[in-house]
Amino acid sequence: MTQKIEQVCFDNSIQPLDPSTVHQVPLATGRMMPVAAFGTFHSDWAQNYMEEATAEAIRLGWRHIDTARAYENEEVVGEAIRRAIREGYIASADELFITGKLWNGHMAPKDVAPAMDTTLQALGVDQIDMYLNHWPWPNVHTPGCATDHRNPGAVPYIHEAFLETWAEICKLKQAGKVVDIGTSNHTQATMKLLLRDVAQDERPVYNQMEMHPLLQQTELRRYFESEGIVCGGYMALGSPNRPGRDTFKEHRADMMDPTIQAIAAELGESLAKVALAWAAQRENKSGGYVAMATRSDWIAENLRVATDDLLSAEQLLRICGDDTPQNPGIDANNRLIWGQVFLWPEADGDWRILWDDSQVLETRAGYQTFKASWEAHHKVQLETTFQG
């Protein structure tokens, strides 16, 4: 079963799950976080059913709601929460674990607090449970932009600048506007720099990143967890309806993988349920996943995965592998969000630079030196290379 966004069907006859049966993972601060987060990423699609889908998710037992200002629907999610309260699905928003994200365009220190206030007002709450910086640099793109969109003002990760943003995020925690803080789309190099330079009570407790059976990110996840940072995976179902700018012929669909299909057949379960079970059970159930759907049966199924262990140890091993030639698993480093629309000029158009830590700068002065060297090199290249 491929979860297609166009298929919308809400059915009140489907019984909710008991939220207390959903597995939770402890954060470094001692709080518990539901591993299953209902996603609201829909920024390039019509929002006419997102309110109903989110309210239905709450009715069916979801208690972790994942939002972001970049999705352009915090107001819609806020109305869904109010609707859930009116309908009696929850007594108040305090029953929810709400994750929000600071958008790249609001990373200037003066913009962080106003961005949070906008989020709180849109959601209709005084506090959220988790606030993440969405990406580690302030590069932006326009909604619905094309694959080849580039922002000439984009820059690589500059640690000096990020620390200034992070300090403002920490102030939000001190002010009681957010309970816990975390990151999203960080790499090992950027996280090492952050952990080096912040106090113990300023450390992120959660990092959200792309993870699914064909992009398992095992080494990176182990690094984060060694530092006490819980990992949650977005694109958990391969996001078959992601924007066109993030769809390329090189991509593979997780639910078309023969191993996923074979295990689904063995269990008599859906392909989506197998993919999410991998996300819920891997690494001793220490992380989480983000998933969304617009049918009541799928919404319930996606949550039910977090209430039991669907996969046997043998089935889990077939997906994960064990680092041996005999059992490599199915990880194919199949990244679906390349992030090419965030590239800076010095990256020369190679989206891999976003993820391989080859252009991580400590200071603004260091970036200016790097930029000048790059520009000089390209000037010589243009002057000496045959142009045909």
Regions found by a protein language model. Give the residues of each.
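Acidic (Asp/Glu)-rich catalytic clusters
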Residues: 26-28, 78-93, 120-126, 195-199, ...
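Beta/alpha (TIM)-barrel catalytic core signal, keyed to glycine-rich beta->alpha loops juxtaposed to Asp/Glu
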Residues: 104, 135-388
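CE4/NodB-like, metal-dependent polysaccharide N-deacetylase domain
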Residues: 112-133, 171-172
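N-terminal binding-site loop/beta-alpha segment at the start of enzyme catalytic domains
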Residues: 1-96, 113, 153, 168, ...
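Alpha-helical scaffolding within the catalytic cores
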Residues: 17-25, 81-82, 116, 188-194, ...
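Structured beta->alpha junctions
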Residues: 42, 69, 102-104, 213
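A structural motif
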Residues: 62, 125-128, 178
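A short, structured active-site edge motif that brings together acidic residues
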Residues: 91-106, 130-136, 208-211
